[in-house]
């Protein structure tokens, strides 16, 4: 769930390819977040990886005060997508911030656990990653000394053409439980089934060779041209075929975890959250529900 310190009541200032069904909002609104959790539950989405920047914006406050309590009322779990793993200065302050939030939150029944440990996803930009194997080891030691064992998911993919796997030094790094990456569009402009299958299979080989779990992204669409007019591009919806193709390719590669990128990253246009600009606002959530063998029944809209 994205959080930022914008002016959510002034929709004209938002630079989005299409509009949320409920209008502009931010993730400190309990009614909106509760609705998000009910939408996810209705579709069969198991968990949210929540964009977390600590005190750098409202995401830290939103996670602890709003999102975690909202998830508690549903079967949906939540975990930290630690963006500070990419955007930080020294490791010491990052250890303190991450250990602090885990100390306060990991015991909550709504916090996502895997193999009995709290999950933390460490976001990295493919072409300029901040963490090194050595600094990750320092981060892991520092955090686990304070909170106990953590299930670490590392965002890691080579971006130089012809590889697109996991760098050898990272495959050899201890303490990483799973490898994945945020989006194919960050490294290659592909979206067709015939392109995705070998791409995911190549990445999966590296992850399996390292003996780690495999996390693969799935996109319903993309349109980041509003926020990146020079470099942005679009992946069309294709009447649902785009998301179906990603889903099929991820399953064929043997993914342990399917990353639905994204629930509500509106500026990039990768969302499954209902939009007022779609003939069926719930089109993507209905797709996910079918995968889970259920009929999607929309929960009531939040009071605004």
Model-inferred region functions:
Residues 1-304:
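Glycan-processing catalytic domains of CAZymes
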